[in-house]
Regions:
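A conserved FAD-binding loop/helix module that cradles the flavin
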Residues: 254, 382-407
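Feature captures the FAD/FMN-dependent oxidoreductase FAD-binding
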Residues: 44, 107, 112-116, 164-215, ...
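FAD-site-proximal beta/loop scaffold in flavoenzymes
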Residues: 219-239, 321-386
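Ferredoxin-type iron-sulfur electron-transfer modules in oxidoreductases and energy-metabolism complexes
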Residues: 1-9, 29-58, 79-106, 438
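Glycine-rich dinucleotide-binding loop and its adjacent helix/turn
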Residues: 92-107, 169-174, 178-186, 205, ...
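N-terminal Rossmann-like FAD-binding beta1-loop-alpha1 element of flavoenzymes
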Residues: 111-137, 250-259
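Rossmann-like dinucleotide-binding cores of NAD(P)H-dependent redox enzymes
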Residues: 135-138, 142-172, 178-179, 255-300, ...
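Iron-sulfur cluster-binding cysteine motifs and their immediate structural context
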Residues: 14-39, 58-93, 137, 144, ...
Length: 438
């Protein structure tokens, strides 16, 4: 593995104006990382990666490299069209160096910050604020950290072990608290957080509400929404011939997961033609390689217990696709997965005064990530809609800096503790046991 990585690193031309770095949403200094590796300074290279991107072990596996660093590599312009595969290099350096990350928390500055959601944006903000001395608590509605990375990306692409290791090295060792199974906006509200001394709150909750197509049959037992299927695919009994409605990255994840779960036939349906596929070319090519089929210009109109009814669509001169009346066809399937898009949950907004949203239900923020409620910041999918992990990290880094500046500018809190001088209970832990002489 190491020799292969070095072979790949040696192909880097060390450009003075590195296009690869420009193509990276968080501007990773790729030439310098590669130079350090080639000079046998792996630890320095790893440190540089993690300082720039706390989720570098994740991004090395799930980033859309073909359109970012590798897609911008100058070697693409050569006749051989063979870019340096930095994803391989980043994965090797980050996973190797991560095992050496055992340092404890930074000195505390006396201020607390709350992070709602443990997806890529929330984890990035939490790690950075803790690095700068804040006492950070993460609140997440699920039992394990990771958000969409754990519950929306299949394990074959991003193993749970990567996120488990992240929790140990970047959260537990750094003193970051995690409250699982705690959905802010229900029992606990944003107002409660400020009451309990948090000086600032970051909202990084993801898009967990599946958007329905509102066609007949979506409630049937052989149907599922993509976001629910990916969260726990083994829980669904959809048979061995599955239709997937959608051709985005999540749809590819659903299709490839179904194959791994034993489906013999999986077919993706798209309302438009092949040029409108929104999934990455890599994901589509892997899906086809694994046996996933595609049907284009098919608009689903009804889900049935034994299949899917679609209507043909045609592309007009204006570029829009319209359905052809009378062209309905029944396609037999044992199960149907609807994977078209996701929306945001609004329980948090409903229970918090002063936070505004747009027509899509996404949070309204200023350039610095601040919401319309003082002290509350937001980023990631909750603001921009569905984005990639690295895009969420890039946004979160800027918001973390804004939160840091905001909290540093707050007046000192000199409110005395009304219970500072009360006596400390020092008798046996149980009065009952004490009375029994135990």
């Amino acid at each position: 593995m190491a020799l292969h990585v070095l072979d790949e690193a040696n192909r880097c031309l060390g450009c003075k104006k590195p296009m690869c770095q420009q193509g990276c949403p968080i501007h990773t200094n790729i030439p310098e990382v590669i130079r350090l590796l080639k000079d046998n300074h792996l630890d320095d290279a790893g440190r540089m990666l993690f300082e720039n991107n706390p989720l570098t072990t994740v991004c090395s596996l799930v980033c859309n490299h073909e359109n970012q660093c590798e897609g911008h590599c100058i070697r693409n312009r050569m006749p051989s069209h063979d870019p340096v595969h930095f994803s391989i290099i980043e994965d090797y350096i980050s996973t190797t160096y991560a095992n050496k990350m055992t340092s404890g928390p930074a000195p505390r500055n006396g201020m607390k910050a709350a992070v709602v959601g443990s997806g890529p944006a929330g984890l990035t903000v939490a790690v950075l604020l803790a690095r700068w001395g804040y006492d950070v608590t993460i609140f997440d509605a699920r039992d394990k950290i990771g958000g969409v990375m754990r519950y929306g990306i299949p394990n074959y692409r991003l193993p749970d072990s990567v996120l488990d290791d992240f929790q140990y090295r970047h959260l537990e060792l750094k003193g970051i608290h995690v409250r699982p199974n705690t959905a802010i906006g229900k029992t606990i509200t944003i107002d409660d957080l400020f009451r309990d001394g948090y000086k600032s709150v970051f909202i990084g909750a993801g898009l967990w509400k599946a958007n329905a197509m509102h066609i007949k049959g979506e409630t049937l037992g052989n149907a599922a929404f993509g976001i629910d299927y990916l969260a726990n695919s083994k829980a669904f009994q959809l048979g061995d011939d599955i239709a997937v409605i959608g051709v985005g990255n999540s749809a590819m994840d659903c299709a490839r997961t179904a194959i791994r779960n034993g489906a013999r036939h999986v077919t993706c349906y798209a309302r438009r033609d092949e040029s409108c596929i929104s999934a990455s070319a890599y994901e589509v090519s892997y899906a086809k390689l694994e046996g996933v089929g595609f049907r284009f210009c098919k608009a689903p109109v009804e889900i049935r217990e034994n299949g899917l009814i679609c209507r043909d669509t045609v592309k007009g001169e204006d570029g829009k696709f319209t359905q052809v009346e009378g062209s309905e066809t029944f396609y037999p399937h044992t199960g149907v997965i609807v994977s078209v898009s996701q929306g945001s949950e609004n329980s948090l907004v409903k229970t918090t005064t002063g936070i505004e949203t747009n027509q899509r239900g996404l949070l309204t923020v200023n350039e610095d990530g601040s919401t319309t409620r003082e002290g509350v910041f937001a980023g990631g999918d909750a603001v921009m809609g569905a984005r990639t992990v690295v895009e969420a990290v890039a946004i979160a880094k800027k918001v973390a800096e804004s939160m840091d500046a905001y909290m540093k500018a707050l007046p000192a809190d000199n409110t005395p503790d009304p219970y500072a001088d009360i006596p400390v209970f020092s008798t046996p832990t149980s009065d009952v046991l004490a009375k029994q002489g135990i």
